[in-house]
C-alpha cells in the first residue's frame, strides 16, 4: 500500500463502520512499512489488509475485500500473503480478532479460537458517547502519574512484554511520541503495577492498551479514572477481554455500553498471559 491508496482503503474499511482514517493507515505503515497490503485485479483495487510483527508474535487485521469479489478466493491470497510475510519476519504466532461468523473461514487456515478464561477469552467492544467520571480517590496504596521522559521506557516495555509475550517497543514508542495521546502509569512502592494508553486523533478516542497486575484491579480502576478525567465529554471506545468481569462492571457503572463481541484467534500458540487488560487496537492486538 502506498499513500495514494489511502482513500480507497479508508472508504472500503468504513463500509464496515470501522471508523478508519488516513492517519490510521499512515500509522500502520510507520510501524510496518511492508505490512499494509493491497490486492488488485489488474489495476483495480479490490481488497486490503494489514499485519504487524512484534518478534515472535504478529497480528493481522483490517481485512476486507470488495463484496463483488468475495467467494472467489481473492481474500485467501491476502491472508496467505500476510501470514507468509510475518513468517519471514520471524513470527511464530499470528493473532487476529474475527467476527464470530468468520471463525469457520479462518479455521481453514489453521487459526484456532480462544474461548477460555485462562487465555482471556473473546473480546467485547465497548463505547461511551459522553464520558463522565467522579474525581479520583487519591488512595495512598499506589500512585498514578502521567508518563513522561523522566520515566525509564525500558521498564514500561518490559512490563508490557511480560504480559503480551513479545516486545512491543516500536508500537509503544510511536504512540508515546504523539502529543495528543495520553499515558498513565501506576507504581506500588518502586514497582510498576500497571499502565494505560489512549489514542486521540481528534474525534473518537481509543483507550488501550491497558495492562495491570492480575491481583490489583484497583490499580486498573484508578488508572482509568485518571485518564477519563482528561476525556470528559469525549466519545470513547475500548476493547475488553470477556473474562474481565470486574473491569466490565466498573466500566458499565461509568456508562459504557457493549457494542458487539469478537472472537480471538491464533495461528500458533498464544503467548498472552492472564491479566487485567484492554487491547491496544483491533488491528494490532
Explain the meaning of each model-derived region.
Residues 87, 112-206:
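Amide-forming acyltransferase catalytic core, primarily the GNAT-like/NAT-type
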Residues 66, 70, 99, 212-215, ...:
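Residue-level recognition of the GNAT/N-acetyltransferase active site
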Residues 86-99, 231-242:
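Conserved GNAT acetyl-CoA-binding A-motif
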Residues 6, 10-50, 161-183:
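Active-site rim helix/loop that mediates acceptor-substrate recognition in acyltransferases
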Residues 97, 104, 112-134, 237-285:
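Active-site/acyl-donor-binding loops of N-acyltransferases
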Residues 180-199, 203-243:
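Flexible loop/N-cap segments at domain edges
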Residues 38, 43-52, 59-64, 185, ...:
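Conserved beta-strand in the GNAT
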Residues 65, 71-84, 108, 216-229, ...:
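Conserved acetyl-CoA-binding loop-helix of GNAT-fold acetyltransferases
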